[in-house]
C-alpha cells in the first residue's frame, strides 16, 4: 500500500469540508447504510454553525485503482492567521497541499496567509477551482489570481508548475477543464497520487515523532498526534518525550496507538515512518515535544507554541444580579472547565490568582 499526506487550504465557505465529504463517500469510507451528517469534518458546534475550521483535524481515505491501494491522510487546516502556530505545525506533517478557491471569489486574504506558510516549507500545491457550476464563475481570471498569488509569495519554479482541477464539491465531480459538469472525483484522486510525493522518511532508524496536535480522552487521558519521522512504533513500546531544547519531559509507554480511518481513530498494533498516528500513554508531553525511543537524545526541529494574544480575568460576580441566572454560577465551576479545556487546547493557559 502506498501513502500520501496532504493538507487542504481554503477560505471560509469556499467548500473545503463539503468536498472532503465527497472524497469520503466516493472512496467508500462511509458505508452505504451509514448515516452521515453534512460537513462531517466540522466537529465542534461552533464550526458547524459558522462553517469555519477552528481546530485542525486529521482523517484519511483509501483509494483503489489498477490493483493498487493508496492510503491518503488528509489534514483539514485552520483558515485563520490567528491560529498561525497550529498552521505551521500541521503543515510539517504533510508532503503536499491542495489550495481550494471559489470559482467566483478567487483567493482571499486568509488563503494567502496559510498558502504562504505552505510554500515556505517547500510543499508542492494542487489548485482546485471549486463551485465551477456557479453562474457567476470566472475560472480563467481566478486561475490567473492564484498564479499571481504564488508569485507574490516567492514560489519556486517547481511550485509554479502546479496542476489545476475544476470541481463541484457539492455535486461530487472534478475535471481538468473548466467546462466539466458531471463525473466523479477520480481526477482528484489521480492528481493527489501523481503530484504529492510519498513521505521520504527513514523506516530503519530509531522511532521519532513530533507531536503536532493535542487531544484528551476521558478514559485514555492525553492523546498526541503527529507523523512518524523515522522508525517504527509498537503498542506498549517504551517511549519518552523531549522538549524543543532536548530536555527530558517524561518517560512512559505507548499504551494505545491509533491510525486514522475516515473520521475515526482506529487502534492499530504498530505504525511506521510516514504514518500519521495518535498515541496515548504520556501525561505531561505536549505539542512541539518529540516523542521518541528511550535511546534518542536529539529532538526534532519544532516551532515553539505561540503565546496567547488575549488575556482575561474571571472574578466573583458581586453584582446585584449574581446567582439569578444559570445553574453553574460558582467560580469553581468556571475554574474546573478552563483547566479541563487547557488539557487539550495548547492555545489556552490558565493561571490561578492567590486565594484561588
Predicted regions and their residues:
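Structural and coupling elements of P-loop NTPases
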Residues: 1-356
